[in-house]
Design a protein with these regions (language model features):
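Basic/aromatic-rich interaction segments and small domains that mediate binding to polyanionic partners
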Residues: 2-78
């Protein structure tokens, strides 16, 4: 399977398309905590690739010290 091309770029302003909850990968918050609510604005600070699925993964800074890993269907351009 060929890697998907990223839809969003570093530095791009985006918004949360859905509520984003901690899946356990955000150590400063309890699992299940709301990290960003639908409509919250943020900036893509890194673009990576999920190795198993060849899908882009975006690190989005929604607030100072609140960088959340997101898939394309979880964010939208501003």
């Amino acid at each position: 399977m060929e890697p998907a091309q990223p839809k969003f770029q570093w530095g791009q302003r985006v918004r949360a398309f859905v509520d984003l909850f901690n899946d356990g990968s955000f150590p400063e918050q309890p699992e299940g905590a709301l990290l960003a609510k639908t409509g919250d604005a943020g900036e893509v600070v890194q673009v990576g690739m999920h190795v198993e699925t060849n899908r882009p993964v975006y690190l989005v800074e929604f607030a100072p010290n609140r960088v959340v890993g997101c898939l394309e269907d979880e964010i939208a351009p501003l």
